[in-house]
Design a protein with these regions (language model features):
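Beta/alpha (TIM)-barrel catalytic core signal, keyed to glycine-rich beta->alpha loops juxtaposed to Asp/Glu
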Residues: 1-130
Length: 131
């Protein structure tokens, strides 16, 4: 949701060639989960400075994440589930590469498959938040 460079022509080429694509890090290194809704947890990936940096988690980014979480809640999904469903919408992306550090995270991620469809209003709301 945050890194959409594939939409600038590459996805069209893949469609023309009959090829699928795999979305890497559809949860934005954990940002598109409920983990960062209240800020940066001390034991988080961002606090450790691994791939995700504290500097990447600005108040504006947190505001976007919270708004997306609100849309997800209206859909009856967790933020992670909605983010995965959004990546897989329309069938252009054939797989989403997600990681899980617990069975609970895996089950939550798989829950996205129960509701992959979006209404036009939901997509418009998401686009408005991401703009």
């Amino acid at each position: 949701m945050f890194d959409r460079w594939i939409e600038d022509g590459l996805q069209d080429v893949l469609d023309e060639e009959g090829m699928g694509s795999i979305a890497f890090s559809p949860l934005a290194q954990g940002l598109l989960t409920d983990r960062y809704l209240g800020g940066i947890p001390a034991d988080s990936r961002a606090a450790r400075g691994a791939f995700l940096k504290e500097a990447d988690i600005t108040p504006a980014r947190l505001d976007v994440i919270r708004k997306l979480n609100g849309i997800a809640a209206e859909r009856g999904q967790s933020l992670a589930q909605m983010a995965i469903a959004w990546i897989l919408r329309g069938g252009r992306v054939t797989s989403a590469l997600v990681g899980a550090s617990s069975v609970g995270q895996l089950e939550n991620n798989l829950g996205a498959l129960r509701q992959l469809e979006f209404t036009a209003d939901e997509l418009a709301a998401i686009e408005a938040v991401l703009a």
